[in-house]
């Protein structure tokens, strides 16, 4: 299999996946929405801004400026933008995509204005295009450095999921498939909010007991919301939910966890965002999850508490006190 792939989004994650595709021998072009960033990648053959550990791109990976002008060249489009830019990117693709082209998304989150799943946004805007989601426990730097990684490809079309699986998989990068695109998206989005909570707990030196409790009860919250939205129960114990939650809550490669850690250390939201100096998906996703939980009458104490710290100026210490002293209940 030798394909031509366009990658839209040149952050660390988009670049890591572009590298993985190039390692497989595909011909890959990557685009950043910032012209000066594209200029840097074209001139130096790397992504010094977001993935400086990779000194040189393979020959099969190059930056591209005006991707719209050469869209007919590509077999598939990989969207790896922040969730805030996903809808705009899909609208741009609608105007120029050809019938044989399909979309793979590596973006985690919900639509920022409607709180819809990103797959729903893509299906509404470009209804006859196949859509697959690549998600799971995967830090960009480790993928780029060819460390063993396992992820999930979710699509309503199992044949397109299998196609995408083969597109990416090699001895360092293993893809599983699922048709539960709802559960895969809910897990990948909500875990970013919970990672902020885990970071707050770490910043306040709460220890590993609290960390274990947060992950376990956080998984229960993901499951409750996911089932309400139509997910399969088996998905929550897999890579896209439990796996991604464990990774993102437990390691400081996670921007969401680092952001929460700085909050737990007493920094303001503005100071914490500035210190991370990159997109913190969980910060905006917290609004969407909070609104969805209210709409569907799902009780999500950890998510609600994190939302209140982020948007209602609640002190993290008060958040913890409220969580620990609320009404006692059965675990299930």
Curated annotation (Swiss-Prot):
Enzyme Commission no: 1.1.1.94
Broad EC category: oxidoreductase
Gene Ontology cellular component annotations, sorted alphabetically: cytosol
InterPro entries tied to this protein: 6-PGluconate_DH-like_C_sf, 6PGD_dom2, G3P_DH_NAD-dep, G3P_DH_NAD-dep_C, G3P_DH_NAD-dep_N, NAD(P)-bd_dom_sf
Pathway annotation from the record: Membrane lipid metabolism; glycerophospholipid metabolism
Subcellular location: Cytoplasm
Protein name, UniProt field: Glycerol-3-phosphate dehydrogenase [NAD(P)+]
């Amino acid at each position: 299999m030798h394909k031509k792939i366009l990658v839209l989004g040149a952050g660390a994650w988009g670049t890591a996946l572009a590298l993985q595709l190039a390692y497989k021998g595909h011909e890959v072009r990557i685009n950043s929405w910032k012209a000066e960033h594209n200029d840097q990648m074209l001139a130096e053959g790397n992504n010094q801004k977001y993935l400086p550990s990779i000194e040189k791109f393979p020959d099969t990976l190059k930056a591209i400026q005006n991707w719209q002008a050469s869209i007919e060249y590509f077999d598939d489009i990989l969207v790896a933008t922040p969730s805030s830019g996903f809808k705009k990117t899909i609208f741009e693709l609608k105007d120029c995509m050809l019938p044989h082209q399909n979309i793979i998304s590596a973006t985690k989150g919900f639509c920022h204005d409607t709180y819809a799943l990103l797959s729903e946004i893509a299906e509404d805007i470009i209804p006859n295009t196949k859509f697959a989601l690549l998600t799971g426990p995967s830090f960009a730097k480790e993928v780029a450095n060819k460390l063993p990684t396992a992820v999930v490809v979710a699509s309503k079309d199992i044949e397109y999921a299998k196609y995408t699986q083969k597109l990416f998989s090699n001895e360092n990068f293993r893809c599983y498939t699922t048709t539960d695109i709802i559960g895969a998206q809910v897990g990948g989005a909500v875990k970013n909010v919970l990672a902020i909570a885990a970071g707050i707990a770490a910043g306040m030196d709460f220890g590993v007991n609290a960390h274990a409790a947060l992950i376990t009860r956080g998984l229960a919250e993901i499951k409750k919301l996911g089932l309400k939205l139509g997910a399969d129960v088996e998905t929550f114990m897999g890579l896209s939910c439990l796996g991604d939650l464990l990774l993102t809550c437990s390691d400081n490669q996670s921007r969401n966890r680092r952001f929460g850690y700085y909050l737990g250390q007493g920094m303001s939201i503005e100071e914490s965002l500035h210190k991370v100096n990159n997109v913190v998906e969980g910060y905006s996703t917290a609004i969407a999850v909070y609104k969805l939980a209210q709409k569907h009458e799902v009780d999500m104490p950890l998510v609600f508490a994190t939302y209140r710290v982020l948007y209602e100026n609640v002190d993290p210490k008060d958040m913890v006190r409220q969580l620990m002293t609320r009404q006692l209940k059965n675990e299930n």
